[in-house]
């Protein structure tokens, strides 16, 4: 338990070189919730409509703030917005390959350090 607490504290205080992780963590709790929600849905192979993502983070920031953050994430190359072929009004969110690879590296490092 001490290893976990020490690692989390050190990892939180240190500046990470991974651009996507730095971006999501720099926006407080809602950025972290958005990051983990997107990755969880991606690895579960479940579609994530933008509206569901907004609702998952509204507890931590205003709707406008969350929508702006999602737009910045997309513009920054960390998220993909995919328009539905069936209903053009529906937009889905997926992580980019950069976000996936940096998360995978971060997760492996995390697991190694808490053993």
What residue ranges belong to the model's regions?
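Short, amphipathic alpha-helical interaction segments positioned at domain boundaries
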Residues: 98-115
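A short, conserved structural fragment
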Residues: 74-84
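Short, locally clustered residues in the helix-turn-helix/winged-helix DNA-binding domain
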Residues: 32, 36-43, 58
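Short acidic, hydrophobic short linear motifs in intrinsically disordered regions
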Residues: 44-57
